[in-house]
Amino acid sequence: MADWTGIQKKAIAFRDARDWKQFHNPKDMALSLALEAAEVLEHFQWKNGEEMEEYVRSHKGEIADELADVLFWLATMSNDLEIDLFKAFETKMKKNEKKYPVSKSKGKHTKYTKL
């Protein structure tokens, strides 16, 4: 299993070997990230619980491909913007812990402003 640095290096090497960095500005990378996330969503649109379980079982490889595309854009964008994504994740989780204390949010899907 690759670590995050390995994933970033592989994504950057793939991009750079094709001379695509010229097309990778923050706006277009963010758009590509959103588009790939939307492709993940397409797999679940209009399916109820039973349909979804069967669909996931029979389309797991396709869903994995789309999630990997999302990971590609996270890796390249965070690299180019010099954002340590693991550090950003830790910082964000600390903020979320304050916004959603277990004592107020456990078992609820309410937004933090309504707790």
PLM features: residue spans?
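Flexible "arm" and connector segments at domain edges
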Residues: 1-67, 71-115
